[in-house]
Amino acid sequence: SDAASLRTKAVRDGEDWVITGTKAWITHGGIADFYTVLARTGVDGPRGITAFLVPGDAAGLSAAVPEKKMGMKGSPTAQLHFDGVRVPDARRIGDEGQGFAIALSALDSGRLGIAACAIGVAQAAMNEAVAYATGRRQFGRPIADFQGLRFMLADMATQIEAGRALYLEAARLRDAGSPFSRQAAMAKLFCTDAAMRVTIDAVQVLGGYGYTLDFPVERLMREAKVLQIVEGTNQIQRMVIARHLAGPETR
């Protein structure tokens, strides 16, 4: 997650910029109308990065074969290759050298979106688990009557409600124009970890059926996993939160 070490370069040529390099793990790679591209225009480190808006059909821009993923099948992810892609200076976003700061500001809002997605996935998994547990009968009664399973459902519901409250509080701070970076990182961390736990437990509630493609909980479990990775891994979220609490690490 060392985003500031990027190697794609943009070189000024009159009123244009010429972009050369490769980008990995690009969402909608190969089908997007536009791409927000961060490229190095100056010194090493964050201050040498500038953002550009590049049309998807720009000359010299090509996409590799999409990655074969365990989830998110509806959104292709692919490498992009920039072979002397020329864009006018009018497509520069912000000032030269502001690209990294722009990207970080977008990450905070993106983390809120991922947190909300995670709670939606978890809610869907719990709904499936409850429906199955109340309909499936063993020993003459619904399996939802068994305390061990009831406690699993209770834990699912508690994690979902806690996560929902956490990301909504961060969203309220954002809407009010207040700092929300720490809360966004907390929401992303908690909600995506909760989604992973809830979906795994939902598969367990359904037993063997949960492991088959005939029921949706296995897909929800696969979809939950990527949410712990995108918009900064959950290990990165812990670093962000800790820096807000204790300051940056000593060097």
Residue spans for each PLM region:
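Conserved hydrophobic/aromatic beta-strand scaffold that supports enzyme active sites
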Residues: S5-K9, D16, F34-L38, A51-L53, ...
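Flexible, small-/acidic-enriched active-site or ligand-binding loops
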Residues: D57-P88
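Alpha-helical interface subdomain recognition
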Residues: A3-S5, R12-W17, Q79-H81, Q98, ...
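A short core secondary-structure module
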Residues: T20-A64
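Short Gly/Pro-enriched turn/cap motifs at secondary-structure boundaries
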Residues: S1, W25-H28, T41-V43, K69-P76
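Short, surface-exposed loop/turn microsegments at beta-strand edges and helix-strand junctions
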Residues: A58-G60, G71-M72, E96-G97, V217-L220
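Long, acidic (Asp/Glu-rich), low-complexity accessory segments flanking structured domains
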Residues: D83-I102
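Short, ligand-facing micro-motifs at secondary-structure edges
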Residues: A3, S62-A64, R91-I93, L213
